[in-house]
Structure formats: structure tokens, C-alpha cells
């Protein structure tokens, strides 16, 4: 089904457990997606001999391609533990992490208290990751959509998503609204001193 002629980008197998009126989504989701139609930052880094590490459902999203190492996770705490260990040990050049709990467990389920607690957990884990980063590391946090747990709907919401980039001894600067993830890709190219093949503009010098 996931072929360009059909324009079906992804088929998701999403298992649940529990009884009627009390179903819970498990972490055994499987995404069957169409391969990216062009170069991505992941494929570009991989083809330039940089080691890549996918944490979470990254492997599914990119057709199980262009990853030196990939691991499946059981929630945000587990994913951030993998990130902490990798940031500390430094075995790969590029780490791509997908965190799902705020969306899957709380946003879609209209659970603002759970969302709040999940965000606090992420905040606690992030501090440990920042502590083990070297001065040569760059970390970028962002998202591809919102899932407002208070809007009375169970679908994705359309607000602007945050983007926070951090380096030790870096600047504390607001860089304004950015249009498109390609600006992140261009910044990563700049960070690894590769030619920028994407339409965006690097903001590395403002971090």
C-alpha cells in the first residue's frame, strides 16, 4: 500500500490491551511507512560515514534504513535512559530520539494531569543528559505537532511547536519563528561541517 502511486504515506499497527471502555495502547506499535522520497538528514549523514543511532520508532519511520544502530523503547523514561547512556559514552556521531508518551498516553487521551507529570519526568531526565554532554555536543529538542490535552478533541492540534537547541558555553538567544524542519537539517549539516543540501538556513552560530 505504501507506494507513491497510492499516496499512502504510512500504515500503523497499533495494539491495545484491556477491556471495553478501558483500553490502553501498548508500546508494541509498528509503523509501515513509504520510504522517504528524497534525501533526509539521516540518509545524508549515513552516506557521509557518520554513525547514526535511532532510539524509539525512528527505525520504523525511516524504513529501517540509514541507521548504524537502532533500539525500540518502552516509553519516554526508557528512551531518555538510552540517550543518557549514549551521551555519556559517545559511541555514535548522531542520535535521533523519538519520545511518544505526551502524545500517545496523555494528549490523545485528553489527560492534562498525566501530560503535566510526563513533562516533569522529561525535565528531570534532561538535566542528567545535559550534565554528561561534552563541550563539542549539540542537542536539539522539537516536535512535529501538538496534541493539546485540554481542547476537547483527541486529534493532533495545530499550534506552533517549540524548538530548543543547546550547547555548553553557548548563547541564550531567542531566534524567532522558523519555517520548516529543513532549518534543523541545515544546522546539523553545519555542525558536522558538511555541505548544506537542504533548503533551510543554519542557525548554529546563534546557539
Predicted regions located by residue number:
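Feature captures the catalytic ectodomains and active-site-proximal regions of enzymes
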Residues: 4-207
Amino acid at each position: 500500500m505504501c507506494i507513491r502511486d497510492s499516496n499512502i504515506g504510512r500504515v500503523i499497527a497499533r495494539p491495545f490491551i484491556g477491556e471495553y471502555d478501558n483500553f490502553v495502547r501498548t508500546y508494541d506499535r509498528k509503523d509501515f511507512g513509504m520510504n522517504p522520497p528524497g534525501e533526509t538528514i539521516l540518509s545524508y549523514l549515513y552516506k557521509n560515514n557518520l554513525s547514526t543511532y535511532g532510539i524509539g520508532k525512528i527505525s520504523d519511520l525511516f524504513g529501517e534504513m540509514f541507521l548504524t544502530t537502532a533500539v525500540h523503547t518502552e516509553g519516554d523514561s526508557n528512551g531518555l535512559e538510552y540517550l543518557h547512556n549514549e551521551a555519556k559514552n559517545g559511541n555514535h556521531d548522531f542520535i535521533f530520539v523519538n519520545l511518544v508518551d505526551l502524545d500517545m498516553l496523555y494528549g490523545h487521551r485528553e489527560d492534562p494531569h498525566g501530560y503535566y507529570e510526563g513533562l516533569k519526568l522529561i525535565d528531570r531526565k534532561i538535566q542528567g543528559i545535559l550534565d554528561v554532554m561534552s563541550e563539542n555536543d549539540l542537542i536539539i529538542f522539537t516536535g512535529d505537532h501538538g496534541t493539546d490535552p485540554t481542547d476537547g478533541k483527541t486529534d493532533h492540534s495545530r499550534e506552533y511547536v517549540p524548538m530548543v537547541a543547546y550547547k555548553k558555553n553557548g548563547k541564550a538567544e531567542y531566534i524567532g519563528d522558523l519555517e520548516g524542519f529543513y532549518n534543523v537539517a541545515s544546522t546539523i549539516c553545519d555542525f558536522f561541517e558538511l555541505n548544506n543540501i537542504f533548503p533551510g538556513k543554519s542557525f548554529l552560530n546563534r546557539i
